[in-house]
Swiss-Prot record:
Residues 26-96 form the BTB domain. Belongs to the mimivirus BTB/WD family. It comes from Acanthamoeba polyphaga mimivirus (APMV). Signal peptide: none annotated. CDD domains: BTB_POZ_ZBTB_KLHL-like (cd18186). This is Putative BTB/POZ domain-containing protein L67. InterPro entries: BTB/POZ_dom, SKP1/BTB/POZ_sf.
Length: 498
């Protein structure tokens, strides 16, 4: 049964459709009235009593229990008639059930004291948002209705039309967990698990999102570009010296980009530079070299430090050398790590409140995971293959070992393996791990760790788009502009009242 036809006909599972609004054995006339019209129905107490708490109460001890004629003022006559039809076993067509019907149906079910799922996944066009406001006002304001308003509020809506207490509540729900992914040199946006929307093309899978500006930076037509996700406006940026961009990171404290690229020209250099997203130009060079390759850029969680590696490859494999460097944005000091590595470092990441590091490399024909704590390196895991590494809560290491995800804890104990959960990993704010690259899957990492410890079944679900070969999936907030407008408006009201 569909969502509209699964509450009723409890009375011995009989179908009384032929008796709806019929003189046959009818023992009560009910007149439904709303603000627009009136409808009279010939009904049967036993059917209404068996299927509806509202009528059960009505027929138990009140005057209506003995009256032949009863008048009921209802929110919407047409929908209330539909609900009574369902009590008689009449299935309703799903055709032409727009969002207005769904919300009014929910309100009428609530009026009749019937359980009904709130229609949370409603999409309303911008021109209909005021109608949505009116309907929510009729239903009442609660967590679900306010969340629905926040989900559908147009970014450019005139927020001065709304009371400040409602805006304060809306502010809690304006963060929309949308995500962007790159596939086949195209960039897609997905809102609320909807169909992926093609935004633009790109020459590189290296893209970067600046959350405070709600801008997406990418390379196209041999130039750096940015898209304003509020308006989908694209602007090209001339950076004449920038060649191949290897990576881009966002400093959330300043909204600047940290770009690692190879320069154009006669003297090709590897560079790390700061790009000002306001002035749209490079403002500072952190490091440049024509002798080394720059790899493994990573930012600390507080965005105060940048770590990267310098590597030099020669024809002699025994002379390979890689060094870790750390740049402090506050002091503008660049420090060289005291140790040199004879193997290539992979997935360098900060850990332990940004004081230490974790990484892996290939050594003695095996891949080995190391932590660097207080400048001392510790080998904590060894396996035949590692393709990616992520760390969770500074305590658990998630390894893509080719055929499975291996979870190990920093005390060197192996927690377990999850087969076919491979690719690169991203950890969401609600403790889900998404793997992407080969396929796209999701699991609740906190629950998984508990289940592994207790030998319980592990549940893996698909996530978002079912496409294979997704690159650079990350979360964005396409309502960031609206959130800032509400915050600024509420601050201005507060200043005025004070």
């Amino acid at each position: 049964m569909n969502n509209y036809n699964n509450f009723f006909v409890k009375f011995n599972n009989q179908n009384f459709s032929d008796f709806y609004n019929s003189d046959t054995l009818s023992d009560i006339n009910i007149t439904l009235s709303d603000n627009l019209k009136t409808v009279s129905l010939k009904l049967h107490r036993i059917v209404l009593f068996a299927n509806c708490e509202f009528f059960k109460g009505m027929f138990s001890g009140f005057n209506e229990s003995i009256q032949k004629e009863n008048i009921i003022k209802v929110p919407n006559i047409d929908i209330c008639c539909d609900i009574i039809k369902q009590m008689y076993g009449i299935s309703l067509s799903e055709i032409n059930r727009d969002w207005k019907y769904m919300l009014r149906y929910y309100k009428c079910c609530d009026y009749f004291m019937l359980e009904s799922n709130f229609p949370e996944n409603i999409n309303v066009s911008r021109c209909e948002f005021d109608e949505l406001l009116d309907l929510v006002d009729e239903i009442g304001y609660n967590e679900k209705t306010i969340k629905l308003l926040a989900q559908n509020m147009p970014i450019n809506y005139n927020i001065t039309n709304l009371p400040s207490d409602l805006l304060s509540e809306l502010l809690n729900y304006t963060n929309v967990n949308s995500f962007i992914f790159v596939k086949d040199f195209s960039i897609y946006l997905v809102n609320n698990d909807d169909i992926p929307k093609h935004l633009t093309n790109t020459e590189s899978t290296v893209i970067c999102y600046v959350p405070n500006l709600n801008r997406l930076f990418f390379k196209a037509n041999n130039r750096l570009n940015f898209m304003d996700l509020d308006t989908e406006y694209i602007q090209q940026i001339n950076l004449n010296n920038v060649g191949i961009i290897n990576s881009m990171l966002c400093d959330h404290n300043t909204n600047n980009l940290i770009i690692n690229y190879k320069s154009r020209g006669e003297s090709i250099e590897s560079r790390i530079e700061i790009f000002d997203t306001d002035k749209l130009k490079i403002t500072k060079t952190i490091y440049k070299t024509n002798k080394y390759n720059i790899n493994n850029l990573c930012l600390s969680k507080d965005f105060s430090k940048l770590a990267f590696t310098l590597s030099k490859t020669t024809l002699n494999p025994y002379t390979y050398k890689e060094i870790i460097h750390i740049y402090n944005f506050l002091t503008e000091e660049l420090c060289e790590f005291p140790d040199e590595f004879n193997s290539k470092i992979h997935c360098l990441k900060f850990m332990n409140n940004d004081k230490d590091f974790i990484y892996y490399l290939k050594k003695d024909y095996h891949y080995q995971v190391f932590t660097c704590i207080n400048n001392t390196h510790h080998n904590i895991f060894r396996t035949e293959n590692i393709e990616y590494l992520e760390i969770y809560l500074d305590k658990y290491i998630l390894l893509n070992t080719g055929y499975s995800m291996t979870i190990i804890s920093l005390d060197k104990s192996c927690m377990g393996k999850i087969r076919d959960f491979v690719g690169e990993y991203i950890i969401t704010p609600n403790n889900h791990v998404i793997c992407y690259g080969y396929h796209t899957k999701s699991l609740d990492i906190s629950q998984i760790i508990n289940n592994l410890a207790e030998n319980k079944e592990i549940q893996i679900t698909s996530f978002g788009s079912p496409y294979y070969g997704i690159k650079n999936i990350f979360f964005v907030n396409d309502k960031n502009c609206l959130k800032r407008r509400i915050e600024d408006y509420l601050k201005s009201i507060l200043k005025t009242t004070n």
